Amino acid sequence: MAEEVEEERLKYLDFVRAAGVYAVDSFSTLYLYAKDISGPLKPGVDTIENVVKTVVTPVYYIPLEAVKFVDKTVDVSVTSLDGVVPPVIKQVSAQTYSVAQDAPRIVLDVASSVFNTGVQEGAKALYANLEPKAEQYAVITWRALNKLPLVPQVANVVVPTAVYFSEKYNDVVRGTTEQGYRVSSYLPLLPTEKITKVFGDEAS
C-alpha cells in the first residue's frame, strides 16, 4: 500500500494536485451549505445531484491522469537536459527554486503582520524581512551568473549605470519628501552603497 501511495506522488506538479484537492474541498463545503439552506428546493437539488454524479463519475480521474502524464513528460525532459545544461545554470536554477519555495511563507508572515498591526507596520515588517533575504539571494545569483562568459564585461557597463540612476531616484525621493509630499515619505531609498559593494566588487 505504501508503494502505491509513493507511486501516486507527482515529482514536479504536486502543487497542481494539491490545488485541485483544495478547490474541490472548498466547492464541496460551499455546495453542502447551499444544499442545506435550499429549503423546499432540496428534492430538486438531490435529483440534479444524482444526474451530475452519473455523468461525472466516469471522467472523474481523467484530469489527474493528464497531470500525471505531464509530470512524467517534464521528468523525462529534465532528465535528458540534465547532462547538457552547464553546472552553473543548474546552480542558479536551484537557487531560484529555493527562493520561490520561501515565497509562500513570507507572504503568510506579511499577511498576518498586516492583519495584526495594520498596513504601514506590515509594510515595514515586510521590508525588514525581505531586505536581508533579497540581498543574500542577489549576491548568490550574481556570483553564479558572473561565472558565465561575457557577464563580467556587461556588468562593468551596467553596474555604474544602475548606481547612477539609483542615486537620481534617491535624490528625487528626498527632494519631494522635503517639499512635503507625503507619498514620497513611504517610498524606500535604494541602497546605492550596497549595490556598489556587492555588484561592483564582483564585476571588477
UniProtKB/Swiss-Prot annotation:
Q: Which InterPro entries match?
A: REF
Coarse class of the protein's main subcellular location: cytoplasm
Output the PTM entry: Not glycosylated.
Q: Which Pfam families does UniProt cross-reference here?
A: REF
Top-level taxon = Eukaryota
Q: Does the keyword Transport apply?
A: no
Kindly state which keywords UniProt assigns to this record, in alphabetical order: Allergen, Cytoplasm
Q: In which tissues is it expressed?
A: Highly expressed in the specialized vessel laticifers, but localized only in the laticifer layers in the conducting phloem. Also detected in leaves.
Q: Where in the cell is it found?
A: Cytoplasm
Record-level GO cellular component terms: cytoplasm
Q: What induces it?
A: Induced by tapping. Not induced by wounding, ethephon or abscisic acid treatment. Induced by ethylene.
Assembly and oligomerization = Auto-assembles in solution into stable nanomultimers of a globular nature.
Protein's job: Involved in the biosynthesis of rubber, an isoprenoid polymer (cis-1,4-polyisoprene).
What the record says about family reads: Belongs to the REF/SRPP family.
Question: Under which name does UniProt file this protein?
Answer: Small rubber particle protein
Q: Which organism is it from?
A: Hevea brasiliensis
